[in-house]
Curated annotation (Swiss-Prot):
Residue stretches spanning the membrane: none
A molecular-function term among this protein's GO annotations: ATP binding
Location of the Toprim domain: 411-524
Record-linked Gene3D superfamilies: 3.30.230.10, 3.40.50.670, Histidine kinase-like ATPase, C-terminal domain
Chain positions of site Interaction with DNA: 442, 445, 496, 614
Cofactor binding: number and manner: Binds two Mg(2+) per subunit. The magnesium ions form salt bridges with both the protein and the DNA. Can also accept other divalent metal cations, such as Mn(2+) or Ca(2+).
Protein's name in the database: DNA topoisomerase 4 subunit B
UniProt binding sites for Mg(2+) 2: 489, 491
Gene that produces this protein: parE
Length: 629
């Protein structure tokens, strides 16, 4: 087993950015996220098999104390930085023993971005460490060291652990008070997800003391949560599988008569409130198994094909994924974006659910009936759209590769820059619900073109016919696709084309934008190869972040960085995984929150008559531009 001391702590960068932009590192509505970071570190000790209990105390002065019986933070001097490990962990951003996997196989808190952020956003932090038969104490004020590490007593050799007591700084939060209900919810979830761990919460304001301890984790948690509701099956469908780099466990059931459902997902015991690729994988695995079950038994009525939402409706689940190097959208870790999670979870769940359905055929048939009935309702509610093979109304553009499905709200149209990329996209798409229309070169700048004349442009005419909505029309009844996705290269030309298309939709198809139907796909600009591992980066900042992390992990080999010159350079499999697969892609919805401000900026950028304003803007703001070479 690896020794966990100061030289196991790796440093990536300083603490300065946190106070300037606290919202990038934590949820600033309340200090609950700070509590979660400290709790995560203690729970990581339990995950690694070093701690059996975690105690959380909310004091009357609104400070919070988290105590565990793990190994204790390192107190020896770091070989490169020349300060004790505990000081490094609390004063340097991205300092921790969790970047490589020597000290923790799976970890949620990066002893790093988390606990140093707690220090940066607190007026005072007091850390006590029991380790090597001594008890140590160190204090911090406003993110800086307030007192040196000192020995304050002796303890038994086996008496180890860490206590972190912090006072959140009210100026960084909308409300400086902890939400007790949310705190208790997180703590109960930790106990559920780490069977055998004892978690205690004490509120000194009310005298309340609660202890959670689950030997039968997910199953009993889910059963308790939906105890009063009719459910199918009666006992949750549970499963788990642990690989060398990832592990997944779940408990799920359906609530045929509805009711308040539980839908919770976690990565390395961190709640992912916005789901992510692991939840997408669970949904896909259940769908694949149910489709197979229905087809094998010939249960599907003619013309009915199960969609993900048919199986997902009225589901209650708890999903726990453990993986090395999870990637999240944003620092607050609320959505998992690691692409490999979707494939791992869907494969494991599909195999397990297929087996379970066939072993419990009677319940399987009831669940199939439920899904088929959901599909029937969906088909009845949605109008059908005639696809390209039907010749009536205006002829659809010849270059449109339409999808087969007839439900407009499920269908997606990708407007793809260039014919070569269009070819890759046609191979990468799911023909059932994804249509492709290649665009030749840059479209017309339509910002100042009158609504009646805009259709004179062949490209704009083809887009209007394909989507089924005329420029300027407010009636979206004939809309043929629920999502219209702009897919252009990640380089400067691609951004120009994407801007012109956004301008077209904002100026001439505004009701589409306001109804949330227009999206911009985010293809990666870089691919990073290191051995067998592949990482994709959206831009330079993400590329640098991945390279920094790989350097901190001290992985063998030199990373090979490839810059995609265009979508056509990606093979169909890469394009599908990074840009088109709903389980693993990134799509940004085009919204108009501040319509007046947005229209003013776009007018200044796109109107021919405002060249003078553009020049002034470039002179005053040109230094803020990102130059893409």
């Amino acid at each position: 087993m690896a020794t966990y001391n100061a030289d196991a702590i790796e440093v990536l960068s300083g603490l300065d950015p946190v106070r300037k932009r606290p919202g990038m590192y934590t949820d600033t509505t309340r200090p609950n996220h700070l509590a979660q970071e400290v709790i995560d570190n203690s729970v990581d000790e339990a995950l690694a098999g070093h701690a059996k209990s975690v105690q959380v105390i909310l004091h009357q002065d609104n400070s919070l104390e988290v105590i565990d019986d793990g190994r204790g933070m390192p107190v020896d001097i770091h070989p490169e930085e020349g300060v004790p490990g505990v000081e490094l962990i609390l004063t340097k951003l991205h300092a921790g023993g969790k970047f490589s996997n020597k000290n923790y196989q799976f970890s949620g808190g990066l002893h790093g971005v988390g606990i140093s952020v707690v220090n940066a956003l607190s007026t005072r932090v007091e850390v006590r460490v029991k380790r090597d038969a001594n008890e140590y104490r160190m204090t911090f004020a406003d993110g800086f060291k307030d007192s040196d590490l000192e020995v304050i007593g002796t303890v038994g050799k086996r008496n180890t652990g860490t206590s972190v007591h912090f006072w959140p700084d009210p100026k960084y939060f909308d409300s400086a008070k902890f939400s007790v209900s949310r705190l208790k919810h997180v703590l109960k979830a930790k106990a559920v997800l780490c069977p055998g761990l004892s978690v205690v919460f004490e509120d000194k304001n009310t005298g309340e003391r609660v202890e959670w301890h689950f030997e039968d984790g997910l199953r009993s948690y889910l059963t308790d949560a939906v105890a009063e509701l009719p459910r199918l099956p009666d006992e949750p469908f549970c499963g788990n599988l642990e690989g060398s780099k990832e592990a997944v466990s779940w408990a799920l059931l359906w609530l045929p008569e509805g009711g308040e459902s539980v839908q919770e997902s976690y990565v390395n015991l961190i709640p992912t409130a916005q789901g992510g690729t692991h939840v997408n994988g669970l949904r896909q695995g259940l769908l694949d198994a149910m489709r197979e079950f229905c087809e094998f038994r010939n249960l599907l009525p003619r013309g009915v094909k199960l969609a993900p939402e048919d199986v997902w409706e009225r589901i209650a689940f708890v999903l726990s994924m453990k993986m090395q190097e999870p990637q999240f959208s944003g620092q607050t870790k609320e959505r998992l974006s690691s692409r490999e999670a979707a494939a791992f979870v869907s494969g494991v769940v599909k195999d397990a659910f297929s087996l379970w359905l066939n072993e419990h055929a009677e319940i399987g048939l009831q669940l199939a009936e439920l899904a088929i009935s959901n599909a029937g309702r969906r088909l009845k509610a949605g109008k059908k759209v005639e696809r390209k093979k039907i010749t009536q109304g205006p002829a659809l553009p010849g270059k449109l590769a339409d999808c087969a499905g007839q439900e407009p709200m499920r269908a997606e149209l990708f407007l793809v820059e260039g014919d070569s990329a269009g070819g890759s996209a046609k191979q990468a798409r799911d023909k059932e619900f994804q249509a492709i229309m290649p665009l030749r070169g840059k479209i017309l700048n339509t910002w100042e073109v009158d609504g009646g004349e805009v259709l004179a442009s062949q490209e704009v005419h083809d887009i209007a016919v394909a989507i089924g909505v005329d420029p300027g029309a407010s009636d979206l009844a004939q809309l043929r696709y629920g999502k219209i996705c702009i897919l252009a290269d990640a380089d400067s030309d691609g951004l120009h084309i994407a801007t012109l298309l956004c301008a077209l939709f904002v100026r001439h198809f505004r009701p589409l934008v306001e109804a949330g139907h227009v999206y911009v796909a985010m293809p990666p600009l870089y691919r990073i190869d290191l051995g067998k591992d592949i990482y994709y980066a959206l831009d330079e900042a993400e590329r640098d972040g991945i390279l920094e992390r790989l350097a901190a992990e001290k992985k063998r080999g030199k990373p090979q960085v490839t810059r995609f010159k265009g979508l056509g350079e990606m093979n169909p499999l890469q394009l599908r995984e990074t840009t088109m697969d709903p389980n693993t892609r990134r799509l940004v919805q085009l919204t108009l929150e501040d319509a007046t401000g947005t229209l003013e900026i776009m007018d200044m950028l796109l109107a021919k008559k405002r060249a003078g304003d553009r020049k002034s803007w470039l002179e005053s703001k040109g230094n803020l531009a990102e130059v893409l070479v």
